[in-house]
Amino acid sequence: MLYPLARHFLFKFNPEQAHDLSIKYLPRLLGTPLDCFFRHSLPKRPVTVMGLYFANPVGLAAGLDKDGECIDAFGAMGFGFIEVGTVTPKPQSGNDKPRLFRVIPAEGIINRMGFNNKGVDHLVAQVKKAKYQGVIGINIGKNKDTPIEQGKDDYLICMDKVYDHAGYIAVNISSPNTPGLRSLQYGDALDELLAALKVRQQELAAQYKKYVPLAVKIAPDLSLDEINQVAASLIKNGIDGVIATNTTLDREMIYDMPHAGEAGGLSGRPLQHKSTEVIRQLAKALDGALPIIGVGGIDSAMAAREKLAAGASLVQIYSGFIYKGPSLVKEIVTHI
């Protein structure tokens, strides 16, 4: 009820300013009378996926809390899991501003942030401080100045540092905003990366005496053949889950709207059906071999149900959350 007022206020700022304000002040509201603004007590909808217990199947997608500075505040909203990041070995500022745009008529967002983050050490410190009892996924990527041929090393560095603190680790090879990154989704490059990650996962599992699942995040802009190849590689390399999908480069749904010409990845409602079709095709190719986390344009319980019906076991929200607010979590969990 209060969120439309808050959104009206936040939308007076440019999108990145609004995001930064939210990340700065949300944690400060916890434990004050104002935390009733977003705190929700939700019905239990427990599921077990990748060997992990989730109080409900609705998660926060990576990108909103890149540095893990709002975990407890988002946890109070009722999320069954929270994915922080994308984080890189070294801090980096990301791409030049402006780099975040609202496509309000379509309830979409275009971003070309470029993995701006404070580095993996800072993120781990934030995760260690968090009191949230749900599953925390940590999304890892490569630094922009790391040559793509050496990208594997960045993922392994991050994996080493986050392993003992993550519920699961998400491997981001599908952001359109880091040059060359999406090339890691194809053929030998994908196999080589996944094989190296799997070996390191097994080494770390022995070291820490616990198994932390690996999930790979893929793009929506893949052909059917490419989806089938990705699925085969995930199975072959023993990956535990797949997150479908990241943002799209496609502008067909918003071609005549403000900011349609901006470079970057499009998320929100315009991505909804495209990502669902990828999930459907991926589920067919995987044939139950590993679970899918469905993300892309979920802005209602019905949209979440469509993702689950297409083959997802869990769902994540981001852009829908920006437009609808914390009540979207309650709506989905209650009516899913």
From Swiss-Prot:
SUPFAM superfamilies, per database record: FMN-linked oxidoreductases
Reaction(s) this enzyme catalyzes, per UniProt: (S)-dihydroorotate + a quinone = orotate + a quinol
Binding site for FMN: A62, G63, L64, D65, K66, T86, N139, N172, K217, T245, G268, G297, Y318, S319
Cell compartment(s), UniProt: Cell membrane
Binding-site list for substrate: K66, N111, R112, M113, G114, F115, N172, N177, N246, T247
Keywords: Cell membrane, Flavoprotein, FMN, Membrane, Oxidoreductase, Pyrimidine biosynthesis
Keyword Membrane applies: yes
Top EC class, one word: oxidoreductase
Membrane topology classification: Peripheral membrane protein
Biological or metabolic pathway of the protein: Pyrimidine metabolism; UMP biosynthesis via de novo pathway; orotate from (S)-dihydroorotate (quinone route): step 1/1
A biological process from GO: 'de novo' pyrimidine nucleobase biosynthetic process
Gene Ontology CC: cytoplasm; plasma membrane
Cofactor notes: Binds 1 FMN per subunit.
Annotated InterPro entries: Aldolase_TIM, DHO_dehydrogenase, Dihydroorotate_DH_1_2, Dihydroorotate_DH_2, Dihydroorotate_DH_cat, Dihydroorotate_DH_CS
Main localisation: membrane
EC code(s) of this entry: 1.3.5.2
Active site: S175
Cofactor(s) for this UniProt protein: FMN
Reported function: Catalyzes the conversion of dihydroorotate to orotate with quinone as electron acceptor.
HAMAP family xref list: DHO_dh_type2 (MF_00225)
Protein name, per record: Dihydroorotate dehydrogenase (quinone)
Organism: Aeromonas salmonicida (strain A449)
